[in-house]
C-alpha cells in the first residue's frame, strides 16, 4: 500500500454554489493541483464535506493532492452545512440520486473537460450513488470507491427496530433530532427523548452518545481510539440534525437488502430503477468496496455486495477491501486513516488511471 506520511499544504482553489433542477442550492469546493484527474467526494447523511477536510489531521484531500489528484467536495442536501435537514421541503434519497449527484458531476465535467473523474462516496452518499449509477445517470466515470455500503444495505436487528420506531412512532410528531444535546435545553418538550437516546455509551460526552444512538441507530459509528481528541471535541460541529422523514426510505432499503427507489408512483423519478441490484449491469467502471472490520453501522454490507455482484454480474470489475480494527466513519475521520485507509484508495485510483493512460 502507498506510504502517505507527507503532509503538504492544501489551499482551497475554488468554491461555488449551484441550484439543482428541483430548486435546491448546493455547494462544491475544489482543492488540489490544477489539471489533475478529479475525485468527487460524497459525504454521508447529516455530516458534511468537512469530514474530508479536517484541519487537525492528515485528511483525504491532503493525501489525494500529494498523489496528484484534484478533490471536489460536494455538500448535497443532507449536509449539516445546509438547512434542509431542519427546514425546507422533505426529501428522500431518490432526490439525491436523481438531482444532487448527477448535477454535481455535470458541473465538475464542465470544468475538467475530458480528464478522468472518480467518485469516493461514504455511507448514505454511496447508497444514493448506487441508484444514480444503475439509472445510467453517471456514464463514463473512471472509477468509484464506496465506503461502508453500496448496493446491499444490511443493519443489525436492533438498528432495524430503531428505524421502525423512528419512522412509525416519532416521524409524525418530531421533524428532526439534534445531534448536539446543547441545542435541546433542559426545558424542551423533547428533553426526555434526547436523554433516553443519549443515556447509554462508554463516552461521557452526550453529543457523542447521541451520534451513536441517533445516526448510528444504536451502533458505534467509529472506534473512539481512532479519533484525534480535537476531532472528538468537534463532534457537535461535524454532525447536524437527523430528519426523520428519510427513515421510511432507509427502512425500505434495509428490508429489501438493496438500494431501492422510494417514489415508485411518481413519474418525476421514473429514471431511477425500482431496485438498483436488478440494473447493476449498467455499472460501467471499476468499483472498490471498502469497509472497516468493526463496522457496526452497516455490518458486512459491502462484503455482501462484493459477493452478490461477483456472482450475478461477473463482468463488473469489483473488488473488496476490509480495513482491520476500523469501524465506519473513522475510515475517513480517524487520525491514522491516512496510513491505514487512504493508501488503498490511492492505489485503486492509480491502477485505474494507468489502465486509462
Segments the model singles out, each with a brief description of its role:
Residues 296-303:
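Conserved alpha/beta-hydrolase "acid-adjacent" motif
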Residues 27, 32-83:
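Short, surface-exposed "cap/lid" segments of acyl-processing enzymes
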Residues 74-91, 329-331:
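Glycine-rich "HGGG/HGxG" loop immediately N-terminal to the catalytic nucleophile
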Residues 110-114, 124-261:
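Alpha/beta-hydrolase-fold enzymes
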Residues 90-110:
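Alpha/beta-hydrolase active-site loop
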Residues 2-32:
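N-terminal cap/lid segment of alpha/beta-hydrolase-fold proteins
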Residues 312, 316-357:
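Catalytic active-site module of serine/aspartate enzymes centered on a nucleophile-bearing elbow/loop
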Residues 283, 289-291:
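Short beta-strand/loop motif that positions the catalytic acidic residue
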Amino acid at each position: 500500500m502507498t506510504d502517505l506520511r507527507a503532509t503538504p499544504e492544501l489551499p482551497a482553489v475554488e468554491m461555488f454554489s449551484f441550484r439543482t433542477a428541483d430548486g435546491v442550492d448546493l455547494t462544491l469546493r475544489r482543492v488540489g493541483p490544477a489539471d489533475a484527474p478529479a475525485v468527487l467526494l460524497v459525504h454521508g447523511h447529516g455530516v458534511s464535506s468537512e469530514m474530508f477536510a479536517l484541519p487537525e489531521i492528515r485528511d483525504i484531500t491532503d493525501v489525494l493532492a500529494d498523489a496528484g489528484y484534484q478533490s471536489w467536495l460536494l455538500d448535497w442536501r443532507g449536509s449539516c452545512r445546509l438547512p434542509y435537514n431542519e427546514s425546507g421541503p422533505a426529501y428522500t434519497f431518490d432526490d439525491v440520486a436523481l438531482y444532487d449527484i448527477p448535477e454535481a458531476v455535470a458541473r465538475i465535467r464542465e470544468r475538467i473537460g475530458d480528464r478522468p473523474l472518480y467518485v469516493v462516496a461514504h455511507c448514505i452518499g454511496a447508497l444514493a450513488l448506487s441508484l444514480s449509477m444503475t439509472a445510467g445517470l453517471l456514464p463514463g466515470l473512471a472509477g468509484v470507491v464506496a465506503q461502508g455500503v453500496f448496493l446491499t444495505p444490511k443493519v443489525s436487528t436492533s438498528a432495524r427496530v430503531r428505524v421502525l420506531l423512528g419512522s412509525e412512532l416519532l416521524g409524525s410528531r418530531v421533524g428532526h433530532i439534534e445531534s448536539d444535546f446543547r441545542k435541546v435545553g433542559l426545558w424542551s418538550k423533547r428533553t426526555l427523548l434526547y436523554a433516553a437516546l443519549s443515556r447509554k455509551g462508554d463516552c461521557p460526552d452526550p453529543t457523542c452518545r447521541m451520534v451513536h444512538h441517533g445516526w448510528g441507530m444504536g451502533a458505534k459509528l467509529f472506534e473512539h481510539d481512532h479519533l484525534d481528541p480535537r476531532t472528538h471535541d468537534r463532534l457537535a460541529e461535524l454532525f447536524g440534525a437527523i430528519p426523520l422523514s428519510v427513515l421510511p426510505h432507509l427502512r425500505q432499503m434495509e428490508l429489501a437488502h438493496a438500494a431501492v427507489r422510494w417514489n415508485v408512483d411518481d413519474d418525476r423519478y421514473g429514471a431511477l430503477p425500482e431496485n438498483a441490484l436488478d440494473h447493476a449491469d449498467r455499472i460501467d467502471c471499476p468499483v472498490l468496496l471498502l469497509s472497516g472490520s468493526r463496522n457496526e453501522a452497516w455490518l458486512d454490507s459491502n462484503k455482501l455486495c462484493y459477493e452478490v455482484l461477483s456472482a450475478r454480474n461477473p463482468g463488473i470489475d469489483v473488488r473488496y477491501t476490509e480495513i482491520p480494527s476500523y469501524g465506519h466513519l473513522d475510515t475517513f475521520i480517524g487520525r491514522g486513516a491516512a496510513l491505514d485507509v487512504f493508501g488503498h484508495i490511492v492505489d485503486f485510483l492509480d491502477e485505474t488511471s494507468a489502465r486509462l493512460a
